[in-house]
A protein has these predicted regions:
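A residue-level signal for alpha-helical anchor/packing sites in multi-pass solute transporters
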Residues: 35-36, 123, 127, 158, ...
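Transmembrane-helix bundle of Major Facilitator Superfamily
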Residues: 1-185, 319-321, 328, 332-342, ...
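12-transmembrane solute porter fold
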Residues: 8-31, 227-241, 247-425, 430-463, ...
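Intrinsic disorder in cytosolic terminal tails and internal cytosolic loops
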Residues: 1-7, 193-196, 456-478
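A gly/Pro-rich, aromatic-decorated transmembrane alpha-helix motif that marks the paired
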Residues: 143, 147-163, 212, 216, ...
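Helix-loop interface residues and adjacent transmembrane-helix termini in multi-pass membrane transporters
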Residues: 42, 72, 95-96, 131, ...
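C-terminal membrane-cytosol helix-exit motif in multi-pass small-molecule transporters
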Residues: 173-192, 208-220, 237-252, 449-459
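Flexible interhelical linker loops that connect adjacent transmembrane helices
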Residues: 2, 180-208, 250-265, 326-327, ...
C-alpha cells in the first residue's frame, strides 16, 4: 500500500472516533447500571453484571480472530463491518425491552468492537511509517484509548441524569454512521497480498472459544469464588481449548497465529508488560469509582466529573511520551510511566474513609494519569515495531487481547483480595479497608510489568530489535 496516497492524519481522526466509541462503551454502562436494572427488571445483581460481562466476553473472545482475518481479507473491510455491527447493536441496545434482549445486543456490540479495535490499530501501523510519524499517531491513539474510559464515566452520568439510560447507547448511532461514511471515503484498504492455501478454521474456533471460556471464568470468580464450579469448569475448558489451539497452530499449513511471531522480542515483551500493567490499571477505575460513591458520597454525574483531571493528564502525558520516545527510546519512557503508576496506586492504598477529593484522591489521579499516558503509547509502539505490514493485524489482535484478558484477570484477583479483607460489605470503613489491599495488589501488578520489560529487553535484544527495524527509521527501544 502507498502510505502517501491519502492524508494519514485524516485517517487517524476517523480511526480515533471509532476507537473512542469502543473504549467509551466499556465504562459508560457502569454509571447507568442501576437505572438499567430498574427499567428492565433484572432479577439480581448477578444477572445485571451480564450487561457488562457479555460485552467483555465477545470483545476479548473475538479480538485475535478479528485481527488476523483483517490481515488476510482486508483491514478496511473488517473495520467497516465492525462499525456496522457496533452501530446497529448500539441502536438495538437503546430500544431493548427486556434484560435478555439487552444482554444479547451487548454481546453483539462486543463482537463489533472486536472487529474494530485490531483493525484500527493495524490501519494506523500500516498508514504511518515507523519512526516519529507513527509515534505521534500512536500518542493520539493512546490518549483516546485511555482517556475515553474516563470520558465514558462523565458522559454516562450526564446522559442518564439529563435524558435516559437509553441515550448511552443511542449516542453511538450518529457517531457510528458518520465514522462509517468517512471511513468509506478516506481510509485506504490494505491486506496481506501473499497467496494463501486455506484458512485455519480449527484454530479460529479453539482460540475464540478458549478466550471466551477464560473470560467467563474470570467474570464469575469474584461472585462465586475461585473453587466454584462456575469458575473451575470454564478454566478447565479454557486450558484444554487453548492447548489444542497451540497444537493446531504448530501443524497448520496456514496457521491463524504463526507462533514464530513471539520470537520478535519487542512484541513478546510488549504483550507481557501490557498484560500485567492492565491487570493493575483496569482496577483503578473500578475501585476508585466505588470509593467516590461510597466514601465521598458523590452522585453518578459528580463521580464521572471527578475523573476529568485524569483524562486531561492522560492527554498531556501521551503527547509528551510521543515526543520523547523517538529521542530517548520507548523503554525509558514506559519505565517512568510504570513507576508513576505504582506511586499512584500506593497513594490510593492510603486513602482514608473520611477523606476528601482534593487532598486524598486527586493527587493519585493526576500522578496516575501521567503514568498511564506514558505507558500506553510506548508499549503499543513496541508491540507493532519491526513487523511486516502483513502481520500488523495479528500483532494488534494479540496486543488488544493482552489488555482485555489482563484487565479481566486483574479485576477478578483484586476483587477477591478486597473481599477477603472486608469484614462487612455494608460498612463503608470495612469496604475502604478492602480497597486498600486491592490497590496494593494493583501496584504489584504494575511493578511486575516493569520487571518483565527490563528483564526481557536486555542490551543484545535491544540491539537486535533496532537492527531489524533500522531500515524503517524505527523508534529506538533503549
Amino acid at each position: 500500500m502507498n502510505r502517501h496516497s491519502v492524508n494519514p492524519w485524516i485517517v487517524l481522526v476517523i480511526i480515533c472516533f471509532a476507537q473512542f466509541m469502543v473504549v467509551l462503551d466499556a465504562t459508560i454502562v457502569n454509571v447507568a447500571i442501576y437505572n438499567i436494572k430498574s427499567a428492565l427488571h433484572f432479577g439480581s445483581d448477578a444477572s445485571l453484571q451480564w450487561v457488562v460481562t457479555s460485552y467483555t466476553l465477545f470483545f476479548a473472545g473475538f479480538l485475535l480472530l478479528g485481527g488476523r482475518v483483517g490481515d488476510l481479507l482486508g483491514r478496511k473491510r473488517f473495520f467497516l463491518v465492525g462499525l456496522v455491527v457496533f452501530t446497529v447493536a448500539s441502536l438495538l441496545d437503546g430500544i431493548a425491552t427486556s434484560s435478555g434482549q439487552l444482554i444479547a445486543f451487548r454481546a453483539l456490540q462486543g463482537l463489533g468492537a472486536a472487529l474494530i479495535s485490531p483493525a484500527a490499530l493495524s490501519i494506523i501501523s500500516t498508514t504511518f511509517a515507523e519512526g516519529k510519524e507513527r509515534a505521534r499517531a500512536l500518542g493520539v491513539w493512546a490518549a483516546i484509548a485511555i482517556g475515553g474510559s474516563a470520558v465514558g464515566l462523565v458522559l454516562g452520568g450526564a446522559l442518564t441524569q439529563s435524558l435516559s439510560w437509553r441515550w448511552i447507547f443511542f449516542i453511538n448511532v450518529p457517531v457510528g454512521i458518520l465514522t462509517l461514511l468517512a471511513a468509506v471515503r478516506f481510509v485506504p484498504e490494505s491486506k496481506d497480498e501473499h497467496e494463501h492455501k486455506g484458512y485455519d478454521l480449527a484454530g479460529a474456533v479453539t482460540v475464540t472459544a478458549g478466550l471466551m471460556a477464560l473470560v467467563y471464568g474470570l467474570a464469575h470468580s469474584s461472585a462465586h469464588g475461585w473453587s466454584s464450579t462456575w469458575t473451575v469448569v470454564p478454566f478447565i475448558a479454557a486450558a484444554i481449548l487453548l492447548a489444542a489451539f497451540v497444537l493446531i497452530e504448530t501443524r497448520s499449513v496456514e496457521p491463524l497465529v504463526r507462533l514464530s511471531i513471539f520470537r520478535v522480542r519487542s512484541l513478546l515483551t510488549a504483550n507481557l508488560a501490557m498484560f500485567l500493567a492492565f491487570s493493575g490499571m483496569f482496577a483503578m477505575f473500578f475501585f476508585n469509582s466505588l470509593y467516590i460513591r461510597e466514601a465521598l458520597g458523590f452522585g453518578a454525574l459528580k463521580t464521572g466529573l471527578a475523573f476529568l483531571p485524569f483524562t486531561g493528564g492522560v492527554m498531556v502525558s501521551a503527547g509528551i511520551a510521543s515526543g520523547l520516545a523517538p529521542k530517548i527510546g520507548v523503554r525509558p519512557v514506559a519505565a517512568v510511566g510504570m513507576i508513576l503508576t505504582v506511586i499512584a496506586m500506593i497513594l490510593f492504598a492510603r486513602m482514608p474513609v473520611d477523606g476528601s477529593y482534593a487532598t486524598d484522591l486527586l493527587p493519585g489521579l493526576l500522578i496516575g494519569s501521567l503514568g498511564m499516558g506514558a505507558i500506553f503509547m510506548p508499549i503499543t509502539l513496541m508491540a507493532t515495531t519491526g513487523l511486516k505490514d502483513s502481520d500488523q493485524g495479528l500483532a494488534s489482535g494479540l496486543f488488544n487481547t493482552s489488555q482485555q484478558v489482563g484487565g479481566a484477570l486483574g479485576l477478578a484477583i483484586l476483587s477477591t483480595i478486597a473481599t477477603s479483607h472486608t469484614a462487612n460489605q455494608k460498612v463503608v470503613a470495612d469496604a475502604v479497608h478492602g480497597f486498600h489491599y486491592a490497590f496494593a495488589g494493583a501496584a504489584v501488578f504494575v511493578a511486575l510489568s516493569l520487571v518483565v520489560m527490563v528483564a526481557l529487553l536486555r542490551a543484545h535484544h535491544v540491539a537486535q530489535i533496532q537492527a531489524e527495524a533500522a531500515e524503517g527509521g524505527a523508534v529506538p527501544v533503549a
